[in-house]
């Protein structure tokens, strides 16, 4: 025959009797040990659950200047570690767990597991590794690149969208992307401004050569007209000086 025995609150005071008397008596928390000590002029109390139980609520309490405990909603529940939780999934444990117990996780249909599919209850009342989550295999709406946009309104598993850029911009990255297990298949693309291409050096040289050629042809034509007119260079120079003087006089 087996009997269950509830272990009532055990209290250990590591402060002077006068300080301890100023703080009110705490309500009992079954299956726990409460240790109080003085820290920087305040009474600090800590709950520790016995083996096979885990803490729910606040672990550490302060007896403040008003000689009141700041919180008393604490309890020790059966099971060495907190009950496992997995939204949109299930796990192998069906009752209170003990130290070193292991559980496995599995997600419901249309959800994918993110994290480890196993976890173990440790001596310090924690699970390791942390519990996973079950994430929908559908995707969240994608973002728009700066100076760009996407086309498509279906974000479910297997659906595709296409990215485009505004006028005078070009796309850098993957244009068409697919929803795969809750994630888009590629990173968000970027829209970059189309820069006017600079003229090549050979084109610049060709332009300079053409201008020089045109200048030479103009000089040859001028010299030919001068020769045909019978005017000498001295007469041309004198004529230009007269024209210059006439223009200057008109400006005055």
Swiss-Prot record:
Positions of glycan attachment: 64, 71, 98, 117, 154
GO biological-process terms attached to the record: blood coagulation; complement activation, classical pathway; innate immune response; negative regulation of complement activation, classical pathway; positive regulation of protein catabolic process; regulation of opsonization; response to symbiotic bacterium
Sushi domain residues: 21-78, 79-136, 137-193
One annotated Gene Ontology cellular component of this protein: plasma membrane
Location in the cell: Secreted
Keywords for the protein's UniProt record, in alphabetical order: Complement pathway, Disulfide bond, Glycoprotein, Immunity, Innate immunity, Repeat, Secreted, Signal, Sushi
InterPro entries: Sushi/SCR/CCP_sf, Sushi_SCR_CCP_dom
SUPFAM superfamilies: Complement control module/SCR domain
Biological role: Controls the classical pathway of complement activation. It binds as a cofactor to C3b/C4b inactivator (C3bINA), which then hydrolyzes the complement fragment C4b. It also accelerates the degradation of the C4bC2a complex (C3 convertase) by dissociating the complement fragment C2a. It also interacts with anticoagulant protein S and with serum amyloid P component. The beta chain binds protein S.
Quaternary structure, from the entry: Disulfide-linked complex of alpha and beta chains of 3 possible sorts: a 570 kDa complex of 7 alpha chains and 1 beta chain, a 530 kDa homoheptamer of alpha chains or a 500 kDa complex of 6 alpha chains and 1 beta chain. The central body of the alpha chain homomer supports tentacles, each with the binding site for C4b at the end.
Disulfide bridges in this chain: 23-63, 49-76, 81-121, 107-134, 139-179, 165-191
Protein name: C4b-binding protein beta chain
């Amino acid at each position: 025959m087996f009997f269950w025995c509830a272990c009532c609150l055990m209290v250990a005071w590591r402060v002077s009797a006068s300080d301890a008397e100023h703080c009110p008596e705490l309500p009992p928390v079954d299956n726990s040990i409460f240790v109080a000590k003085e820290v920087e002029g305040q009474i600090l109390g800590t709950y520790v659950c016995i083996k096979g139980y885990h803490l729910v609520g606040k672990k550490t309490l302060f007896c403040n200047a008003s000689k009141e405990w700041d919180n008393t909603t604490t309890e020790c529940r059966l099971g060495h570690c907190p009950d496992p939780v997995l939204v949109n999934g299930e796990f192998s444990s069906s009752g209170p767990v003990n130290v070193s117990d292991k559980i496995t996780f599995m997600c419901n249909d249309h959800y994918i597991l993110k994290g480890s599919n196993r976890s173990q209850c440790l001596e310090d009342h924690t699970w390791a590794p942390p519990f996973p989550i079950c994430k929908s295999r559908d995707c969240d709406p994608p973002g728009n690149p700066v100076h760009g946009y996407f086309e498509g309104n279906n974000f479910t598993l297997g659906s595709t969208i296409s990215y485009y850029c505004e006028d005078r911009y070009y796309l850098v990255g993957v244009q068409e992307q697919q929803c795969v297990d809750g994630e888009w298949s590629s990173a968000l693309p970027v829209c970059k401004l189309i820069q006017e291409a600079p003229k090549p050096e050979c084109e610049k040289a060709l332009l300079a050569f053409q201008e020089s050629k045109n200048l030479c042809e103009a000089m040859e034509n001028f010299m030919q007209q001068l020769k045909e007119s019978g005017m000498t260079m001295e007469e041309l120079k004198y004529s230009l000086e007269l024209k210059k003087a006439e223009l200057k006089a008109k400006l005055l």
